[in-house]
């Protein structure tokens, strides 16, 4: 039995879905524990792409059960559409392999509308996906939320909707002056979706607990990345949930279950979608080259990702925040055959040199300390035994600065293009 957590170690989009899909081959459960359909995971199998937003990456493996934990904010419209889209591709999804926590907080039309009008009416853009994630978490924390199980009870759903709409109605009508669905319109839509999706509702807490007790392999699949964590991230340019390993405990399982591996997924360079500080961002042709070669366009938003050199002070910070045991390095092939290759090993900040970021640091004011690395060249024939010396040096530089080993290396989009230096499912 192995308990494995997959955490994004940057600002999201690191390739978590690819690693989760690969590990799912040996997993009994793959669990989503936070976020919502603002996540976007791309899986490539036999040259065919599959895009996932809510459903865990284990869905492509028939023996693997997929769990959406109670820490996820659930858009029932998005879930229904994703199930329908995947089933149309011949991917089996049923109440036998998909389990959705009855306690997931529901995203309504009101949340999505509020998300959109706030972003368009503020001078400080956060770069929200507009999926209603933040407003749904607000309702959850303020105890105005609607749970998945509430969709199955007409009286309860109507009363919870009335509570949720009470304040928002004033905002829509008097402040933002926008049209919004009536309570009855929203009720009719959500109740109908509830009847359709009820088959997937489950006590996921007990499902996970029993799987661990039975010695099953469980993989927890994070969304976004540590640097977007509402507490640890680059606030206010963050998401609304705990994207660090702490999110597993609050969103899926109990603190009584330890983890055998906490794998930090990171690209061989750095990307960011939306607003916020980015110390190593490249504004020149090199940045454009990485963006083009890496296909850096958001799966969820369609926005072009900002690109820059690998930032080791931030990676070390992420490792500390989530107690990472190792790094899974992705998209190494994007850096192949570059004329110039650099990595950030530290910052100059307030008259000092620092080598690990921390919560109070102002990343707008740091000056990255960049070192030149020898460029390397790899192709699909790369193995652990024929790896170029320059690439080995690049990997060793990362390990030495962050203080944990690199346990796998991805050098292409498909699940076959990964070198594993460690068996995550092997004890000891």
UniProtKB/Swiss-Prot annotation:
Keyword entries, A-Z: Cytoplasm, GTP-binding, Ligase, Magnesium, Metal-binding, Nucleotide-binding, Purine biosynthesis
| Reactions performed catalytically | IMP + L-aspartate + GTP = N(6)-(1,2-dicarboxyethyl)-AMP + GDP + phosphate + 2 H(+)
> Which of this chain's residues are annotated to bind substrate?
299-305
Q: Which GO terms describe its molecular function?
A: adenylosuccinate synthase activity; GTP binding; magnesium ion binding
**Record-listed IMP binding positions:** 13-16, 38-41, 129, 143, 224, 239, 303
Establish whether keyword GTP-binding is in the entry. yes
Kindly tell me the pathway this chain contributes to: Purine metabolism; AMP biosynthesis via de novo pathway; AMP from IMP: step 1/2
GO cellular component, as recorded:
cytoplasm
Recorded hits in PROSITE patterns, A to Z, give: ADENYLOSUCCIN_SYN_1, ADENYLOSUCCIN_SYN_2
| CDD domains reported in the protein's UniProt record | AdSS
Q: Where in the cell is it found?
A: Cytoplasm
Which positions bind GTP? Answer: 12-18, 40-42, 305, 331-333, 410-412
| Chain residues that bind Mg(2+) | 13, 40
One Pfam family, please name it: Adenylsucc_synt
- Name the InterPro entries for this protein: Adenylosuccin_syn_GTP-bd (IPR018220), Adenylosuccin_syn_Lys_AS (IPR033128), Adenylosuccinate_synth_dom1 (IPR042109), Adenylosuccinate_synth_dom2 (IPR042110), Adenylosuccinate_synth_dom3 (IPR042111), Adenylosuccinate_synthetase (IPR001114), P-loop_NTPase (IPR027417)
The annotated active site, in chain numbering, is: 13 (proton acceptor), 41 (proton donor)
Which superkingdom? Answer: Bacteria
Please name the GO terms of the biological process aspect recorded for this protein, alphabetically: 'de novo' AMP biosynthetic process; IMP metabolic process
Cofactor annotation: Mg(2+)
Per the entry, the cofactor note is: Binds 1 Mg(2+) ion per subunit.
Q: What is its EC number?
A: 6.3.4.4
Query: Oligomeric state and partners?
Result: Homodimer.
Family the entry assigns: Belongs to the adenylosuccinate synthetase family.
Protein name (record)? Adenylosuccinate synthetase
